[in-house]
UniProtKB/Swiss-Prot annotation:
One of its GO terms (cellular component) is ribosome. Keywords: Ribonucleoprotein, Ribosomal protein, RNA-binding, rRNA-binding. Binds directly to 23S ribosomal RNA and is necessary for the in vitro assembly process of the 50S ribosomal subunit. It is not involved in the protein synthesizing functions of that subunit. The keyword Translocase does not apply. GO terms for molecular function: rRNA binding; structural constituent of ribosome. One of its GO terms (biological process) is translation. Belongs to the bacterial ribosomal protein bL20 family. This is Large ribosomal subunit protein bL20.
Amino acid sequence: MSRTKGGTVTHRRHKKVIDAAKGYYGARSTNFRTATQAVDKANQYATRDRKNRKRQFRALWIQRINAAVRQHDEALTYSRFINGLAKAGIEVDRKVLADLAVHEPDAFSAIVDQAKAAL
C-alpha cells in the first residue's frame, strides 16, 4: 500500500486560517503562524464580547428608561419606577420599555403614570 502524503489536507487547513485572517494588517494576513495566532485571539475576543454585548445592551436600556422616566417626572428614579411596575403588576421587559421610551413617548408616559400610582 502506498504512503499517503498530507499535502492537500495541510494546504486546506492553512487556506482556511489564511482566509479567516483576510483583511488583517501585515504578516497576520499572509503568514500562517501569525495568522493562526491572530485568528485564535480574534475568536477569543468574539466569544468574550458575545457575553459582554448582552450586558451592554441591558445597561443601555436602563439608561434610556431612566432618562425617559426623569423627563416625565424628575422626582421619580429608575429604581422606584421598576418597583412601581412590579407593584402595578405590569410585566414589560427593559428592552420593550426602552423602545417605547424612544419611539412612543405617549405610551411610555401612560406606563409611568400607572407605575407612579402603584407606589
